Amino acid sequence: MTKYVGAIDQGTTSTRFIVFDRKGQIFSVAQREHEQIYPRPGWVEHNAVEIWLNTRTVILEALEKKGLSTSDLAAVGVTNQRETALLWDRKTGEPLYNALVWQDTRTDQLVARYAKEGGQDRLRAKTGLPLATYFSGLKLHWILDNVPGARAKAEAGDALFGNIDTWLLWNLTGGPDGGIHITDVTNASRTQLMDLEKLAWDEDILKLFNIPAACLPRIVSSSERYGTGKGPLEGVTLSGILGDQQAALFGQACLHPGEAKNTYGTGNFMLMNTGEKPFPSTCGLITTVGYKLGDAKAVYALEGSIAITGALVQWLRDNLGIIKNSADIEPLARTVSDNGDVYFVPAFSGLYAPRWDDSARGVVCGLTRFANKGHIARAALEATAYQTREVLEAMVKDSKVAIRELRTDGGMVVNELLMQFQADMVNVPVVRPKVIETTALGAAYAAGLAVGYWASTDDITQNWGVDRRWHPHMAAEQREHLYGSWNKAVERSLGWAR
């Protein structure tokens, strides 16, 4: 019997291949970063070919590290940065343009146009999403309108559209030589083109955005046998697809209504399982598909998305040179006892949930001659916690469910200063699991369940375990003073891009 399940974790800054055992423990991992392309202010692109080549490389490296072959893998799943979208030539496999990253704001004029005609929430009832630059349907709209020849190819069926999951699955199954053109329900729900209840492309929205159905992938469940790999995964069953945040929800064993997790990565993403019916938000959150296992009913989620959290640490490293490595942020922040009344609002791509303001831009408030780089570092970390509190409060108000603990995952959860401050700010315990790579683990679970490697979701629940728990210690008066000052800083960030 095969011993392992693999997961491709294609994120905003890097691609990893992780091999898991039956207990959900990491057996092998390889990782490669890819270039971030910034052609203009607000524009963010990725080279999709570079991402595909990195994917091939990390698969081979992770297997070679432990002397594994593809025959040791029962199945492989894919999880991906959602909303990042591209259009490519069906015959050659060449992208017609760089992938437009989820943070990219070039569709702001399209958002304004459609919002003016019918309001920002005109598509929320069908899609669960407000009009925003975040989602990939309008990114496709921009490519079709601005890349020479793109629309003609798309209408003829000679160009294929997809988020990164679709791009990788197509290449992994042969590319121009019979590649499978599919996307799962979680990724499709991030395009703003899918009807949440019907789980199908919506003809009225396609007509509104002038998008040809011929270029769209077939929508499938998150866990089923899609096909067999070629190239680096020759002969391996490909059987799991989940957008990264839904994968983390699944990997965190949030399998019952009311259970929630918060991922700390390039951005922050809090998701709460709401069961088998879409739960409309009135507090600025989005309604999305959580997962769908084969023929079972889809499970839905409420989500609060924060654009810039870990990316702010990268910005301090790469753009300002305040730190040499991302891990240096915590010791630098610990050189000061508090934030020195400095507040950082990292609205580099506007503000996402619950405010949804594309006009906001980043600001630092409260600077005096007393402030130093330690205060800047601390303010950057605290910004993540303030934004998370804002989303958590909206989620509690929407769902009418009190969150008793916050399950966390992602790269930033190794930062103990941040985790303690997060517990203080939301006033509930913050929990870090033993395996923090829950995004990749969720994709592995989806793939493994489809082929019987794991018998049921009970195995997922049994595998989950606590590594550390942080309890709130901050006095209520101090907590509310800090949060009130943060909100004052947010008001200063609004309206800059108008």
UniProtKB/Swiss-Prot annotation:
It catalyses: glycerol + ATP = sn-glycerol 3-phosphate + ADP + H(+). Transmembrane segments: none annotated. GO terms for cellular component: cytosol. Sn-glycerol 3-phosphate binds at residues 12, 82-83, 134, 244. It is an enzyme of class 2 (transferase). Pathway: Polyol metabolism; glycerol degradation via glycerol kinase pathway; sn-glycerol 3-phosphate from glycerol: step 1/1. One of its GO terms (molecular function) is ATP binding. Pfam families: FGGY_C, FGGY_N. ATP binds at residues 12-14, 266, 310, 314, 411. The keyword Nucleotidyltransferase does not apply. Glycerol binds at residues 82-83, 134, 244-245. Key enzyme in the regulation of glycerol uptake and metabolism. Catalyzes the phosphorylation of glycerol to yield sn-glycerol 3-phosphate. Belongs to the FGGY kinase family. HAMAP family: Glycerol_kin (MF_00186). This is Glycerol kinase. It comes from Azorhizobium caulinodans (strain ATCC 43989 / DSM 5975 / JCM 20966 / LMG 6465 / NBRC 14845 / NCIMB 13405 / ORS 571).
